[in-house]
């Protein structure tokens, strides 16, 4: 049985004070919550501090990016082994903001996926379509192409112990969200697409929804059979709002 995972992507937000206060708030809010995995991905500069603040809790540490290179003359980059060394477990790759602003290709993201698997880390592979692609009816084709970059190079087995986050780009930070039925349809397509190569692996892949999840829509989203939690942006910067989403996932999947 799949256990849901709710992960907070802090993006380019934070300070030493915020790290301390937000994690203290999360530990308090989530102390009695069971049945849902929880992770946070602060900016890289705060990973060590966050790891210390998370000690003894059930909240896992994540990161927002990784480089394809293992070491060497690559100024400004962070390697998979460095992330592992500092205590990170879940690593976000393929986020639409990196695909857009840093021109990261499907093939480049697949390389990151492989580097993370080799290091024993868990990729959180973000896929999803833009508003124009959505309106053109290309949602499934775009998601398939982004998945195939990994499937065709690393095989379906690479998706063992992996997270996929479906993030309709048109719903990120816009306040828009896919309806639960719309999101479920895409999540089922993603699972079925992986299942074409390996049904057993597809069944255990955690597929998160990542399009403006908030306290108001979380419960209804999580009742869908193929939505296994969420990758949360803005709401992850407030302990109470994030906790509501985690609790909704735990409650929805408990049955």
From Swiss-Prot:
One of its GO terms (biological process) is glycerol catabolic process. It is an enzyme of class 5 (isomerase). It is found in: Cytoplasm. Substrate binds at residues 9-11, 173, 212, 233-234. It catalyses: D-glyceraldehyde 3-phosphate = dihydroxyacetone phosphate. Its EC number is 5.3.1.1. The active site is at 95 (electrophile), 167 (proton acceptor). GO terms for molecular function: triose-phosphate isomerase activity. Gene3D superfamilies: Aldolase class I (3.20.20.70). Keywords: Cytoplasm, Gluconeogenesis, Glycolysis, Isomerase. Pathway: Carbohydrate biosynthesis; gluconeogenesis; Carbohydrate degradation; glycolysis; D-glyceraldehyde 3-phosphate from glycerone phosphate: step 1/1. InterPro entries: Aldolase_TIM, TIM_sf, TrioseP_Isoase_bac/euk, Triosephosphate_isomerase, Triosephosphate_isomerase_AS. Belongs to the triosephosphate isomerase family. Involved in the gluconeogenesis. Catalyzes stereospecifically the conversion of dihydroxyacetone phosphate (DHAP) to D-glyceraldehyde-3-phosphate (G3P). HAMAP family: TIM_B. Homodimer. This is Triosephosphate isomerase. It comes from Pectobacterium atrosepticum (strain SCRI 1043 / ATCC BAA-672) (Erwinia carotovora subsp. atroseptica). The lineage of its organism: Bacteria, Pseudomonadati, Pseudomonadota, Gammaproteobacteria, Enterobacterales.
